[in-house]
């Protein structure tokens, strides 16, 4: 990664305070739920895309899984590596862009959670190509019939909070379901303009299909409240549970 991407700058800056966010406080319960959904064999290999400070990766490694954590932010990964050492577990940390990675091995499972790259658009990134590239790269990293769990922003919830004035002022684009906002400056860093993409369930079915994956379930996936319950209009995130059934139809990232 040569020039820093918008979200790389954002997460590098927020790495020191990331785990102060309230949504990071339910890791053990979230991993319990993931393992119920995934039915993995002991020691199975897991790829965590957009692993951040490694809270899910480390908890999975504590339970004996073979975990690789991939993230765009070197600062987040540095904190993840420190936390893994403190916990006495080994995780393979990889600094890479989720839209462009190719890995040398295949995994039993992949996770991409809590806005872990999917739909976090850099300036100029296409609102369809970005998530599709990530899905295809995840799919290529999976063994046949392997499972994937992603949480993505729920368009129904995003739509309900925006007005026509937001559209006129460029804060929300109803054609692409992209929300534009500015993160305030902190610790000498300038304000950072960010773009977040939300999704509707029908397009998720199509995107996953293009990536060679079949969607098994979609649940309400708001952080801190995961469970096998129907999606409603107020869920901040959708949890998608899918299985790899074919190689991706669409082109993925490059090295």
Positions of PLM-derived features:
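Class I SAM-dependent methyltransferase SAM/SAH-binding core
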Residues: 57-100
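A short glycine-rich, Lys/Arg-flanked "PGG" loop and its adjoining helix->strand segment in the class I
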Residues: 129-144
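C-terminal lobe and adjacent flexible extensions of AdoMet/dcAdoMet transferase-like proteins
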Residues: 203, 207-255
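A short acidic, Gly/Pro-enriched loop at the edge of an enzyme's catalytic core
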Residues: 102-109
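Conserved class I S-adenosyl-L-methionine
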Residues: 1-44
């Amino acid at each position: 990664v040569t020039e820093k991407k918008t979200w790389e700058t954002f997460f590098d800056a927020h790495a020191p305070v990331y785990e102060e966010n309230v949504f990071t406080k339910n890791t053990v319960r979230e991993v319990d739920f993931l393992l119920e959904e995934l039915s993995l064999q002991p020691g199975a290999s897991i790829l965590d895309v957009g692993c951040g400070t490694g809270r899910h990766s480390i908890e999975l490694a504590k339970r004996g899984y073979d975990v690789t954590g991939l993230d765009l932010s070197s600062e987040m990964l540095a904190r993840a590596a420190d936390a893994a050492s403190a916990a006495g577990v080994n995780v393979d940390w990889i600094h890479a862009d989720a839209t462009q990675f190719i890995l040398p091995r295949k995994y039993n499972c992949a996770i991409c959670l809590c806005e872990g790259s999917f739909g976090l658009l850099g300036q100029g990134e296409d609102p369809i190509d970005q998530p599709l590239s990530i899905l295809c790269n995840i799919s290529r990293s999976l063994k046949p019939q392997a499972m994937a769990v992603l949480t993505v922003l729920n368009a129904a919830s995003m739509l309900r909070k925006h007005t026509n004035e937001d559209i006129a002022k460029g804060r929300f684009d109803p054609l692409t379901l992209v929300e534009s906002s500015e993160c305030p400056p902190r610790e000498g860093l300038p304000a950072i303009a960010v773009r977040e993409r939300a999704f509707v369930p029908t397009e998720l079915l199509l995107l996953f299909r293009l990536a060679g994956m079949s969607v098994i379930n979609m649940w309400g996936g708001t952080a801190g409240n995961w469970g096998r319950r129907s999606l409603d209009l107020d869920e901040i995130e959708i949890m998608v549970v899918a299985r790899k059934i074919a190689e991706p139809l669409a082109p993925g990232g490059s090295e």
